[in-house]
Amino acid sequence: MPTISVDQALIDRLVSKHGYQHDTEYLAENLPLLGTDIDKCDAETLDIEIFPNRPDLLSGETLSRAIRNFIHNAPATPNLDIKQGKLELIVDSELKEIRPVVLGAVVRGVNSGASKMESDAFIKSLMDHQEKLHFALGRGRKRASIGVHDLTKIKPPFSVKAVTNDTHFTPLSMDNEMSIKQILLEHPKGIDYAHLLDGFDKYPVIVDAESRILSFPPIINGDHTTVTADTTEFFIDVTGWDYRSCEACLMLIAMQLEEYGGTIESVKLTTCDGSIKHLPNGDAIEHKLPKKLLNGLIGERLEESQISRAINRMGGKLISKDDEDITLLMPRWRFDILHPVDLLEDIAIGHGLSLIHI
């Protein structure tokens, strides 16, 4: 299971700004009830193993959001607030055979911290989160890979094109231009992930209005879009082969930035098949849970108020309840919810497994 290490100061910052008091001892006692294993919880650090079915907990920022609901009973917000933006991302039809899923989002007004220590911790957390998502959802960047850019250093609209391997740009943390062929053969990230582009004679790049390469997914970003502690406006790209994985990665990175005061904006996307969409979609997903299934597997009848409190602790909302079904709203980024049994598990955890008599 992936392990994350989070500064208690970050959790305190993101919990207290919503009016809740962070208590490390109480956290250590109760957070495992969410379905996690704590390796270490002291005054400075929380080291925690995240179960594979909860990739939405893989950063200190998204974990803090869950802590507010689960530990402090904060009202859940399963809908993600996304303003309609004007930025355009246009995908060439050639990408259909190379890397067909391309998504994007903008986040503005991010404040990474009041001190260098806070800002440095923010950059480290953002980088760590990307790599954790590449492993957990991206399956080593095959299903999904993420690029995060300083939006002020590039000029929209952006295009995603297929180019030959003699195309040059300066990759992240390098001083000189390299060709795509050189990157795949010589750059550490190229060596690690070149196999994902085996068999292609053209390669995906994202370029801005001035033809500068932002990204060569799933390998490396361009150096000129590097995010720093001073970055306040971000462009996120996610590309891959699996739409659900890409969508979850996009939303989770955007949510991480939102925790620092950022406002998420949608991108007008022209896909490789020519359709036009405004993404990401922050609307929660409505689920039906048969009452017979809930009562049968939990072994007792929960009152409506108990169900409402339980699902709120897990980030969802009870919408209605009739003779047959319970209707729930769950966040779109809860990638793990595929079946009514997954909803049942959330209710059981939110209610308290120790309170259920089977």
PLM regions: where:
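Short beta-strand-to-loop capping motifs
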Residues: I50-P52, V107-S112, I236-G240, M330-R332
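Polar, glycine-rich mid-to-C-terminal structural blocks
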Residues: A105-G109, S125-M127, G138
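Acidic/polar, glycine-rich intrinsically disordered N-terminal extensions of enzymes
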Residues: D7-R13, K17-L31, D39-D42, T77, ...
